[in-house]
């Protein structure tokens, strides 16, 4: 949070002292650390914005998050009284039918309000519950947070087990479940009160094998947002390797309790370090596949209308990085029987980029949306403007010709293609692979993930961006139960040697 030039004096809320600089240091020195934490929390409760708090106390947004988490026990965006319920369901709701989900509003029906930082939109569990369960089925959320999934399960007549390792999150969930449904609206549905308790997703004690019909999980990202003030077992406090190691236990437990043929959905995103992406999402997908799951769908959760302007747009162009604007929602299935792995047979084509027009407003986030009839021209123009020129850009399109029973044959095919272009690639240049997920035998082959896994063994390539490209006019209906795959990926690698 940058200090504003509009405020010339700052007043200590504890002793009334006025000074020409933020009062945070004064409060800590004269009144103590605990008084400082409570003063910040009081300002938050009074409705002061994050920017105003940052200016008043001289703290960053990250510091504010840690202070609120310490004061309240859970990371929330506002400290307010329970909301007044104005509606019990979303208006004009329809099931999503493509692999890109984006919601204009976060969702504020029932007790949903989005105060819990990192909570997912209630549209996500509503879609999952309605698509993959029937009334009376059992839904499990092992990272319940503010209770979004539990509230939706109660509204939709499903049984629910809701657990979280943070006691403050459990208390918040219980508060959000304190409502009585009007029988005039729900007279045909049986209402089940969710079973809410403190619990560790790595050890789902008390839940029988093969007993759950749907798992909805939104685990804390490794080191992205602090969800607790130091609760033992909080995955958000771990670095990426530790996070993935603990998620293996989570995946194993989810596999154990899920019924064969049932679904497990996990919302997860990526991180960034040194202006390069860390593919936590694809690594997490790999963890669940190793546990025995099959990938039924791979949804891109897009931030709606996320287009940067001003400061962040300038920073994106100046330092050549894209702002993360998407997450992954892999929907796994516990197989009901044997289904042998089928390895994709790949082919690759080098795409020549010539005479690309200059882009007046270059893309600055990881989600690129273009008109369908002009998608490829605008996509290639953005690629060339950001990564081309003298940087020696090479674009390779990877496609699947067929599949065959096997294990890892696709690795050889991709590396063979790269061997043709890497000798000509210059240090500081870029190799970009255009890939799409494909569906075979009812399951999704995550070709982008497979490609990234393969290229980890090539030291001169450093993954810089995972870009998702999609048309602006997505279909609103579908004739199949499967989601229509509408997105593609651009995997941007920097040549380091």
Q: What are these regions, as identified by a protein language model?
A:
Residues 2-18, 22-33, 37-497:
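Class I S-adenosyl-L-methionine-dependent methyltransferase catalytic core
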